[in-house]
């Protein structure tokens, strides 16, 4: 008879312990319910990129001296620089400059080592397309400045703050 009583007592203790664990986990869940969300609704809300963000490369054709330093420092020899030598003035004349962003790793070496600062990184990071050949930007496409996320009234921008406010 005693083993049966101790079995019921042991069963009761296990039930109380299980109920306590369930209650503790429920309290933890409720404590997280009043916190602000960490995620954002991406297409409609965007984070403002940091100052040193490495996005699409912007190219200024008039500043380039066709020295090809960008090609030499690129780990994958990506920028394509076409030039011809003007013998009368003894200078290189830039004909074409292109970068294929389907291959680019956005390391920023070309921007860092450019002696004339004709290359710069923009805040544009949405380069997706259905055709990979559209990612090959020539000097005209590289010269376009991206539309700023801050000026777009259809997108709510969120500053780099520790917590995101919800509406």
Curated annotation (Swiss-Prot):
Binds 2 [4Fe-4S] clusters per subunit. [4Fe-4S] cluster 1 binds at residues 64, 67, 70, 114. It is an enzyme of class 7 (translocase). It is found in: Plastid, Chloroplast thylakoid membrane. NDH shuttles electrons from NAD(P)H:plastoquinone, via FMN and iron-sulfur (Fe-S) centers, to quinones in the photosynthetic chain and possibly in a chloroplast respiratory chain. The immediate electron acceptor for the enzyme in this species is believed to be plastoquinone. Couples the redox reaction to proton translocation, and thus conserves the redox energy in a proton gradient. Belongs to the complex I 23 kDa subunit family. This is NAD(P)H-quinone oxidoreductase subunit I, chloroplastic. It comes from Vitis vinifera. The lineage of its organism: Eukaryota, Viridiplantae, Streptophyta, Embryophyta, Tracheophyta. The gene is ndhI.
């Amino acid at each position: 008879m005693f083993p049966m009583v101790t079995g019921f007592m042991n069963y009761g203790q296990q039930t109380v312990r299980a109920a306590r664990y369930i209650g503790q986990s429920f309290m933890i869940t409720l404590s997280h319910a009043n916190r602000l969300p960490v995620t954002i609704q991406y297409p409609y809300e965007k984070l403002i990129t940091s100052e040193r963000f490495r996005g699409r490369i912007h190219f200024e054709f008039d500043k380039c001296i066709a020295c090809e330093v960008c090609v030499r420092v690129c780990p994958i020899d990506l920028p394509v620089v076409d030039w011809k030598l003007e013998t009368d003035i003894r200078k290189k004349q830039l004909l074409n400059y292109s970068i294929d962003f389907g291959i680019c790793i956005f390391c920023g070496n070309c921007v860092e080592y450019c002696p004339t600062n004709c290359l710069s990184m923009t805040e544009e990071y949405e380069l997706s397309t259905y055709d990979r050949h559209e990612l090959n930007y020539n000097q005209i496409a590289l010269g376009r400045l991206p539309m700023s996320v801050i000026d777009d009234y259809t997108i709510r921008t969120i500053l780099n703050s520790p917590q995101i406010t919800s509406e």
